[in-house]
Amino acid sequence: MTMWLCRAGRFGEYENKFIEDGCIYCTWDNLDVALTNFKSRQDLQDYFVSKNDETKVKTAMNWASQVWPFGNEMAVGEIVALPSKINSVIHFGRITGEYEFNADAPNPFYHRRSIDWFALNVPRSCFDQDILYSFGAFMTICRIKQEKRVVKAIEAFQNHGPSAPSGDDAHESSDGAIDIEAEALSAIAQRMIQKVKGHDLARIVD
């Protein structure tokens, strides 16, 4: 079973649209060309370089490694994880449609895949720390390599509600580097919520 991480914008600004539309989008800015037009990942990389003279080859390689799978590797039936930047939860969906390109869509929603969101608002606390590191990968789109453990945690949440993670050690995480800042901020926020309530928390936010 293949599982993908797909973010809803750098700051989670498209999260509600992803959920409400029942879709995931490849939200690369001004990428108004069908991904299936490129015969290889290298062709996509070359396109990024040619479109902007200031784009370095390594940067284009990074972008292509994320964008290419959306149009050419993801498949119907595979699972997508959407980490929320609004709340400390993760949404999970199953891909139900092939890659679609709409040249008339508003930027950056040219590229989409339909999704059945079968598990919304699964608390981060349901997952072991190494899995959370996977969800914190510093990439917009990448593979998640702990599929079985993730699915097991989702099923446990759906059947019994939040429970303590197993604490099993594992070395595989994801195809991307970890967004340490995002994970640290999430941990700090959770600690504050546990320690401070009501108006005291409001004063801290102010």
Each predicted region: which residue ranges?
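Mixed-charge (Asp/Glu-Lys/Arg
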Residues: M3, E13-Y14, F18-T59, A64-M74, ...
